[in-house]
Design a protein with these regions (language model features):
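Cysteine-dependent PTP/DSP-like catalytic domain, specifically the C-terminal lobe
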Residues: 106-133
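Active-site-adjacent bridging/hinge elements
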Residues: 35-50, 106-114, 260-268, 302-317, ...
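Signature of N6-adenine DNA methyltransferases within the class I
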Residues: 63-64, 93, 100, 126-156, ...
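Flexible, glycine- and charge-enriched loops at secondary-structure boundaries
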Residues: 58, 107-110, 324, 328
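Extended, charge-rich low-complexity interaction segments
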Residues: 179-219, 412-419
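Short acidic (Asp/Glu) and glycine-rich catalytic loops that position anionic groups and cofactors
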Residues: 18-23, 45-48, 115-118, 157, ...
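Post-Walker A helix-loop "phosphate-sensing" segment adjacent to the P-loop in P-loop NTPases
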Residues: 101-105
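Preference for the N-terminal adenyl/adenosyl cofactor-binding alpha/beta module
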Residues: 1-100, 120, 124-130, 161-171, ...
Length: 419
């Protein structure tokens, strides 16, 4: 298990005893019988309603998530899907189960299924608690029997990351065929950077292993101030000679940060900041985006976020000011931004749960057009929108406001949302 924001519990007095006691209590449950995202209730009890409102989080009922996944992912074995706002993992659960059921039907071995599902079903969220729970939900969807079978090591592909990439709207971490990850802890006048040659990111599992080993060597079994050789690591992981100087510099930076007492989760930080950037590379785009974006209203956004939201919305033909300004929310921009960044250009499909206002209200007029001007590095993002699901008549309401489900595909020519 990698170090993250929550591993402090094993470093405090009696922390290991607490973990063992908790594990015994959790073991009382029959986790083989799980048929839905059981952790969303835990998330909603840990994160206050006020905080969830500020984040625009409204959790999707499992029956709806299952129906959306069945519609959006008809061929799970050959479809790479991303939930860019995965929360506790509701959509991920049903995508994993759908993939494994198809794998069983196709006669795939357990190892083939686990390798395939972790390649084809990916999640991302901005909230570290949600990401931790979503990773557990992902494993529950796989199930204890599959996890106990003979298999290769797996890394759960659920990442802590800013899917919107607000900070990179005008810039990127990529520079001259390198990934440059800033330390960004506000403790240096000149910001240091971890540098990784682009060639090392082609294989996500190999990159994760490299970062994990660098972080482990920097934080364990090393005398203060020492910079041990890592030639064996270069050999074991087949690091090309031309990439070794950058990796050496990155390792020395990790050692310095550890010696200065500046956190010990740099490996976790690098992997999770790198993953949105990696997914945004054209060669890594997914076939389907599915999920429930944040429904954060403009009037509830912080001022600096309001300014960025307006600027990015105007550039994509989504801003409708005057009487509509306070009624706009993040969901439309989030969906368009996710399509720009992560969806393959020809035929990539989307399926998102959104407020029902998207169907006919003025603040969503630009979204319903299917043409989003100024998107990313192109003049226009064109989307052919399909007939939506209008859930306004569903009772009881499962969100504070009524909902819909929007479907569409990237296309050469836009098709407005059918009325």
């Amino acid at each position: 298990v990698e170090s993250d924001f929550f591993d402090w519990v094993v470093d405090v007095p009696k922390g290991d005893s607490f973990v063992r006691t908790l594990a015994r209590r959790i073991a009382r449950f029959d986790w083989r019988a799980v048929e839905h995202d059981v952790l969303k209730v835990l998330y909603e009890s840990v994160i206050s309603a006020e905080t969830r409102k500020k984040l625009g989080e409204y959790y999707t009922p499992d029956w709806l998530a299952q129906k959306v996944v069945e519609t959006a992912v008809p061929a799970p074995l050959t479809t790479r899907a991303l939930d860019p706002s995965c929360g506790s993992g509701t959509f991920l659960f049903h995508m994993v189960r759908r993939y494994l059921a198809a794998g069983d039907k196709a006669g795939h071995t357990m190892a083939q299924q686990l390798d395939g599902v972790t390649r084809n079903v990916v999640g991302m969220d901005l909230h570290p608690v949600a990401v931790t729970l979503a990773r557990v939900t992902y494993l529950l969807a796989i199930g204890p029997e599959r996890l106990a079978a003979e298999r290769n090591p797996i890394r759960v592909p659920v990442f802590l990351g800013d899917s919107m990439q607000w900070r990179n709207a005008r810039s990127s971490l990529w520079s001259a065929h390198e990934l440059r990850v800033p330390v960004n802890d506000q403790r240096e006048l000149t910001e240091s950077e971890f540098v990784f040659p682009q060639s090392l990111l082609a294989d996500p599992a190999a990159f994760d292993e490299l970062v994990s080993q660098l972080a482990d060597r920097a934080s364990r079994g090393r005398k203060h101030g020492a910079r041990p050789s890592h030639n064996a690591l270069f050999l074991n992981l087949a690091i090309p000679e031309d990439a070794q100087p950058a990796i050496t510099a990155t390792f020395h930076l990790m050692c310095r940060l550890h010696d200065e007492g500046r956190d010990h989760i740099w490996g976790y930080y690098i992997r999770n900041l790198a993953r949105p950037e990696w997914l945004a590379r054209p060669e890594n785009h997914v076939d389907v985006l599915v999920g429930n974006p944040p429904w954060l209203a403009f009037r509830h956004m912080p001022e600096d976020m309001q300014a960025d939201f307006r600027s990015m919305s105007e550039a994509r033909g989504l801003w409708h000011g005057k009487k509509y300004a306070t009624n706009q929310d993040l969901s439309a921009l989030f969906v368009v931004r996710a399509m720009e960044l992560y969806l393959r250009r020809e035929g990539g499909r989307v399926a998102f749960v959104m407020p029902s206002a998207v169907l006919d209200r003025g603040q969503y007029e630009g979204f319903r057009s299917g043409t989003y001007a100024g998107a990313q590095d192109q003049l226009n993002l064109q989307v052919a929108l399909d007939p939506p699901w209008d859930l306004r008549e569903v009772r009881p309401h499962f969100f504070p406001i009524s909902a819909s489900v929007v479907f569409g595909a990237r296309a050469k020519t836009a098709s407005p949302m059918p009325e």
